[in-house]
Amino acid sequence: MKRIIYLIMVFLMASCAKQPPQHFTHDLLNRMTPIKDQGNSETCWIYAMLAAIETEHLSWGDSVNLSPYYIEKMLEQEPQCPASRRGMGATLIRLIHKYGIVGYNAMRSVDTPAPRFVFMLGAEYTPQEFARSVCARDEYVALTSTSREPYYKETVLNVPDNWLHDRFLNLPMDSLLAITLRAVRQHHGVCWESRAHAMAIVGIAHNDQGEPYFIMKNSWGTDGPYKGLDYLSFDDFKTQTLAVELPRFVVYASN
């Protein structure tokens, strides 16, 4: 989201500072599918949540590469969807359960017709049947942190992107960070969202000063110094996070 403005800001800062990109050492990098490019669309939330689901399956040894264009096509059938096509990771989960999902190679452009069937390992499925094997109902939980609502209770985020009025479990920020860290260290898929952008968290790194960062899988192609990855400091996680989606059982794990 807001990609053009972001790129202009990055270009201006780089032109003024002329500084090389910051160096990061990877402490943990989870498996992921190839970096994709959302183009000029504001559908980063689709790419981020699908990337989290893909990483989750890769951690099981199951290779899944999903089509963001299929979900973008299904938005045409959603009367509540804003013209911007913005949404949240929780929105993506709802849409998968409603419309299903197909593999990336089955639909590589939003301008192509949506496939009626998915062919996998010699078997034929509807998109809805395939979706049930990719993302079980209630498999993921949506989390947030706001001091304006009671902690450990569910709340509806009052933001335009939450046009399906999904509910989020409200946690103290330190707890949200700890749960996110646990999920990443256990190789689970995690979708992270600010008010402006969404990415998948795929690992942990540190800079030359030893400061910790999350490794982020972006959806802006492989141009740039980090070849499609980005880095989010733990401090920025605390100040910028709007929501996180991750496997439900991670929240209730004992350690």
Annotate the PLM regions.
Residues 13-15:
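C-terminal motif of bacterial Sec signal peptides marking the signal peptidase cleavage site
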Residues 64-130:
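Papain-like cysteine protease catalytic cores
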Residues 33, 117-255:
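Active-site signature of cysteine proteases
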Residues 38-53, 82-91, 197:
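Active-site nucleophilic cysteine motif
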Residues 2-7:
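Sec-dependent signal peptide recognition
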Residues 17-19:
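Bacterial signal peptide processing site
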Residues 47, 51-60, 95-102, 182-183, ...:
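Structured segments of extracytoplasmic/periplasmic soluble domains
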Residues 43-46, 70-73, 92-95, 103-106, ...:
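Structural recognition of the beta-strand scaffold that forms the well-ordered cores
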